[in-house]
Amino acid sequence: MARSFAQLARTAEKTKGSVAVPKEPLDHPPLQIHTLGNGVLRQSTRRIGKVDESVRDLVRDMLRSMYAAKGIGLAAPQVGIHKQLLVLDLDLETPTTPPVVLINPEIISSSATVETYEEGCLSIPGVYLNVVRPSEIVLSFRDEMGRPRKMKADGLMARCIQHEMDHLEGVLFVDRVTDENELSLELKEHGFKRADVRPLV
C-alpha cells in the first residue's frame, strides 16, 4: 500500500541514523552543482546496490549542497555522481521537518490529469518556465536505510519528484518546455545556450 508523503515524513522523524543536516547556508558546500551545458548532466545513471553509510554520507553532502543553494530538490547527476539518488525538502523553514531521500526510484503509475506549473532548477539558475506533468504519481524506492517503500504524491511533491527523476535519465526541465520563444528568451537572458536543450516535445 502506497503511503503519503506526510506519513513517510513522520516515520523518518522516528528513524535512527537520520541523514538530516542543518538547513543553513554554507560558504563552501561539499559538492559542486553543475549547470546546463555541462555534459555530465546528460549521462545515464546506475542503480545503487547496497545502501550503506557511504550512501548516507553522500545524501548528507547532497542535502548540505542543496540547502546552500536554497533549493528544494537535488539529484545525484547534478553533482556529477551517476547514481539513482535524489533528495527533496519542501519545507526549508522548519528545521525539524525531515528531508525525503529516494534511492532507485521508479514511477509505478501516474494520473491522466496533468497540470502546468512553473519550474526552476539549480542547474539552470534564474530560468523559470512552465512545464506540463501528471498531477499525481505512485512510486517505489528505497529509503536511506535501504528499506523498500512506496509513496503516493501529488501537488508540488509529485512535480518535484518527476523533475528530479528526469535528471536520472539525463533530462532537464527545459527539454519539456513547449513555448519555444519564451524558452529562447529566458536562456539567453541568463547566459545559457539554446543548443544545449534537447527537446522532448
From Swiss-Prot:
It is an enzyme of class 3 (hydrolase). The active site is at E164. GO terms for molecular function: metal ion binding; peptide deformylase activity. Keywords: Hydrolase, Iron, Metal-binding, Protein biosynthesis. One of its GO terms (biological process) is translation. It catalyses: N-terminal N-formyl-L-methionyl-[peptide] + H2O = N-terminal L-methionyl-[peptide] + formate. Its EC number is 3.5.1.88. Gene3D superfamilies: Peptide deformylase (3.90.45.10). Its cofactor is Fe(2+). Pfam families: Pep_deformylase. Binds 1 Fe(2+) ion. Fe cation binds at C121, H163, H167. PANTHER family: PEPTIDE DEFORMYLASE. HAMAP family: Pep_deformylase. NCBIfam families: pept_deformyl, PRK00150.1-3. Belongs to the polypeptide deformylase family. Removes the formyl group from the N-terminal Met of newly synthesized proteins. Requires at least a dipeptide for an efficient rate of reaction. N-terminal L-methionine is a prerequisite for activity but the enzyme has broad specificity at other positions. This is Peptide deformylase 2. The lineage of its organism: Bacteria, Bacillati, Cyanobacteriota, Cyanophyceae, Synechococcales. The gene is def2.
